[in-house]
Amino acid sequence: MFQEYLSVIVKGIPTSLLLTVVSLLIAFFLALFLTFLLSMENKWIKSAVNLYLTLFTGTPLLVQFFLIYAGPGQFQWIIDSPLWYVLSNAWFCAALALALNSAAYSTQLFHGAVKAIPKGQWESCGALGLNRIQTLKILIPYALKRALPSYSNEIILVFKGTALASTITIMDIMGYARQLYGTEYDALTIYGIAGGIYLIITGIATLLLRKLEKKVLAFERFEVSKA
């Protein structure tokens, strides 16, 4: 029975991984844009971004899934518009929910890294005659390198968050596990297999991300040894 269950549940791995990659790509670029806006000296823009961050970091991801998937269908004008073509697609809604949620947390990470940039680097850019936008274009990539260890954890959280996609009919790892449980009622074995798959994938991803961190943050070790 174990092998039969495993052969069914592993069918959801490609969907879970694809959801993770697509969501992270959207979230990363959105977070970069929002970090840029937060670093500008405009209180209205900063207030709007902070409202978005509060909404998506202050509410459960599961609630966001249901609001994005079921919410638009409450408005006839959305149903009659071209938007309904994508908003009625469960896969798109799952990717959107994950992306918006991850972008909020990633923005906090990136903006924190920007604020942690030594004052001397800001002053150096100012001494070169660079304006605020030009300075941010130079310093944000540096800040992203410093934020990588924390962002690695966000990548893992997004992958594990894909398990919620099964609640809106997506056949990912948990989707196949839930379907299998509906016919076999062997919760311990079925969900144990699903949990094991998540554990193995997150373990591999963690090892790869740690190696990436060592390469990307090598400049810090060089600076320390040089000092």
From Swiss-Prot:
<dbReference type="InterPro" id="IPR035906">
    <property type="entry name" value="MetI-like_sf"/>
</dbReference>
<keyword id="KW-1133">Transmembrane helix</keyword>
<feature type="transmembrane region" description="Helical">
    <location>
        <begin position="78"/>
        <end position="98"/>
    </location>
</feature>
<dbReference type="Pfam" id="PF00528">
    <property type="entry name" value="BPD_transp_1"/>
</dbReference>
<keyword id="KW-0812">Transmembrane</keyword>
<dbReference type="InterPro" id="IPR043429">
    <property type="entry name" value="ArtM/GltK/GlnP/TcyL/YhdX-like"/>
</dbReference>
<keyword id="KW-0997">Cell inner membrane</keyword>
<keyword id="KW-0813">Transport</keyword>
<feature type="domain" description="ABC transmembrane type-1">
    <location>
        <begin position="13"/>
        <end position="209"/>
    </location>
</feature>
<dbReference type="GO" id="GO:0005886">
    <property type="term" value="C:plasma membrane"/>
</dbReference>
<comment type="similarity">
    <text>Belongs to the binding-protein-dependent transport system permease family. HisMQ subfamily.</text>
</comment>
<keyword id="KW-0029">Amino-acid transport</keyword>
<dbReference type="InterPro" id="IPR000515">
    <property type="entry name" value="MetI-like"/>
</dbReference>
<protein>
    <recommendedName>
        <fullName>Arginine ABC transporter permease protein ArtM</fullName>
    </recommendedName>
</protein>
<dbReference type="GO" id="GO:0006865">
    <property type="term" value="P:amino acid transport"/>
</dbReference>
<feature type="transmembrane region" description="Helical">
    <location>
        <begin position="51"/>
        <end position="71"/>
    </location>
</feature>
<keyword id="KW-1003">Cell membrane</keyword>
<feature type="transmembrane region" description="Helical">
    <location>
        <begin position="188"/>
        <end position="208"/>
    </location>
</feature>
<dbReference type="GO" id="GO:0043190">
    <property type="term" value="C:ATP-binding cassette (ABC) transporter complex"/>
</dbReference>
<feature type="transmembrane region" description="Helical">
    <location>
        <begin position="155"/>
        <end position="175"/>
    </location>
</feature>
<feature type="transmembrane region" description="Helical">
    <location>
        <begin position="17"/>
        <end position="37"/>
    </location>
</feature>
<keyword id="KW-0472">Membrane</keyword>
<comment type="subunit">
    <text>The complex is composed of two ATP-binding proteins (ArtP), two transmembrane proteins (ArtM and ArtQ) and a solute-binding protein (ArtI).</text>
</comment>
<comment type="function">
    <text>Part of the ABC transporter complex ArtPIQM involved in arginine transport. Probably responsible for the translocation of the substrate across the membrane.</text>
</comment>
<dbReference type="GO" id="GO:0022857">
    <property type="term" value="F:transmembrane transporter activity"/>
</dbReference>
<dbReference type="InterPro" id="IPR010065">
    <property type="entry name" value="AA_ABC_transptr_permease_3TM"/>
</dbReference>
